[in-house]
Amino acid sequence: MGVAVVMGSKSDLELVRGALDTLESFGVEYTARVISAHRTPAEAAAFAKEVESGGKYQVVICAAGMAAHLGGVLASYTTKPIVAIPVPSQPFGAADSLLAIVQMPPGVPVAAVTAGKAGGKNAALYAISILALSDPALAEKLRDFRRRQREQIIAADAELQKELAK
């Protein structure tokens, strides 16, 4: 059970790093690739067909900016879940990539997460939640992660209250 992480350009690696680090921290196997929907469309189609026919990947995370068609192209060749990270670029920030991701025609869904670096982490957590549906140990790791997040916020609030009470 694994995740394919595909970026449209190697320059997206810094943003995708959050996804890779999160997958590693949960012990989820992944493969990372650079494949462009526009510059290497044949390779994009071939990779998506590999994802569809093989059992290696259950979820695909992709990151692309501008005319972010990578997720849609991959989704057109596989029924596996596609999670897309909108990559900010000039002059529109992440608005253009977000719209390209969410404006898919009926029948070819692509999920979108937060734009930018937070999107990398959220994409991985979303992929992990999908994998956890059939992996009880991974589901427990995800519950532990959420508990730790809650505890950190409660501790931060207690610290703030203590500081403000002075």
Task: Identify the role of each PLM range.
Residues 1-39:
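Glycine-rich phosphate/diphosphate-binding loop of Rossmann-like nucleotide-binding domains
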Residues 2-7, 31-33, 60-62, 83, ...:
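Short glycine-rich or small-residue beta-strand-to-loop segments that form or flank ligand, phosphate
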Residues 10, 35-37, 65-66, 87-90, ...:
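Short, ordered loop/turn segments at secondary-structure junctions
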